Amino acid sequence: QSPVANLSNALAGKLPGLITVQTSGQPGEDASSLFIRGVGTYGTSNPLVVIDGLPRSQTDFNQLDANEIESVTILKDASSSSLYGIQGANGVIVVTTKRGVDREKPLISFTVQQAVQQPIRLPETMSSYEQALYYRDMDMNDGQTERYTPEVLDIIKNGSDPYLYPNVNWFDEILKKNSMQSQYNINISGSALGKLRYFISGSYVNQGTLLKHQDIFEKNYGVKSKFDRYNFRSNVDLDATSMLNIRIDLAGRLETRVGPGSDFSNVFSVITTRSPSSQPVFNPDGTLGAGSALEIPFQQNPYGIVTQSGYYTRHTNVMSGTLSAKHKLDFITKGLSAQVYFSFESNNYQHTTRLQSFDSFWYKGKDATGEAIYQPHSVKSRLSTTDSRWVERYTYLDVRLNYDRTFAEKHQISAQLLGNRTLRSQNAELPYAYQGISSRIAYNFDTRYYLEANIGYNGSENFPPKKRYGFFPSFSAGWVLSDEKFISLPSWIQLIKLRGSYGTVGNDKIGGQRWLYITEFTPGGTAMGTYQFG
């Protein structure tokens, strides 16, 4: 297991066909974007995530504790993902969490992981002297008067006046070489009464920040940059009768993110684009610098952004529950069963942002009397407060009829008929809805020859009423050559399988707005959903 706080990063290079792209190192926000066989559609190109048989968000997947997971499988081709119809165009990630097994005594597992997070590559930056030489060459090539005299170049080179002619490596000034990450997990699994099986898991993750000067930040605001996450999961299986199995799954997640008022991505953007000669970190009197003899002040001091621009706190509470019942219907025909899933998820978010500006001054040298000259650049303000709260709710109903039977020890037939409906709502808005039916039939002979057909008829309300549903068929065939007696293989080859498939899948993530089909286009429009002509 990779010691990562975000599950998506643990999959990098582990599954064929899965591409992971990590774009941030901010604690709690370092998830990778996932793509199966690259970008395949317009709009959203992320795969559908299915956890224990039910669709979930990629955030739910990202924040899973790796110790809860039994297996992760990706469905890449149209045949395997067509059951998901209108949501399957970008492939499917199927996650199965751990469940209890029959054992005489409970199995208790405790895991501790400590990790060091370190940027593997940062941009190389010029020094102020190297920058000045480039400006000198540019002026010479353009036939312009050189902006830096030889005397000024010597001062910059020697660093004899770091306040008027600063040379600041902002990466070294703002970022630490590494930060710590801690993970703790405890699992308990077992059985009772011969009918009950359980798996219970609890975990805690803490990510530190790569930003320096956290003692100053904590002194100013009484908070510390961090990411904390608590995970809980309970999977219980009950054999109510010899024909009826009941499954009760509960899961929860509590997250807290704290950081400077300026978002981490903005901090990184600032230090990436800031010139080494733009300003000193501090002036001779200890105030924050703004501008220099080489550049007039027009941007905020990165040190002040990290330590004195305010702070944010983000709390996320997620609770989900799934109730499932599976009943064997062998009295109708052997291998037939019916299964019902009902799942509910509630996500509560509370974001608080408190921002302020800070004092900074442009040091312009000394006057004739030797007094330092300072020009105010920014003035400290009171903390402003912005609060936002919202709730997301998901309900999912799934009804399945399954058939799985083997005849004469070589002919295996399996089939499934499935109907489902998903509702997602945020605060008091009308819920988003998905619904559809799908079926699958598969045959294999002697585990050598495989045939499969899938049909999906799924709908999304992101489309006009008469165009919400689509028909998604698929077919596949496979042949395990390595099991043929007439083929002799060397010992180092264990499996050769040919497989071909064809199918149709869809994608309804075509835009950020909900009912794109009623977007208005009006001359002179300025409101959202209108187009400005001319």
Where in the sequence are the language-model features?
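A generic structural signal for short coil/turn motifs at secondary-structure boundaries
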Residues: 58-59, 81-83, 174, 209-211, ...
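Membrane-proximal, glycine/serine-rich, low-complexity loop/turn segments characteristic
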Residues: 1-48, 54, 61, 67, ...
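Short acidic loop-to-helix transition motifs that present clustered carboxylates
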Residues: 27-29, 55-57, 78-80, 422-424, ...
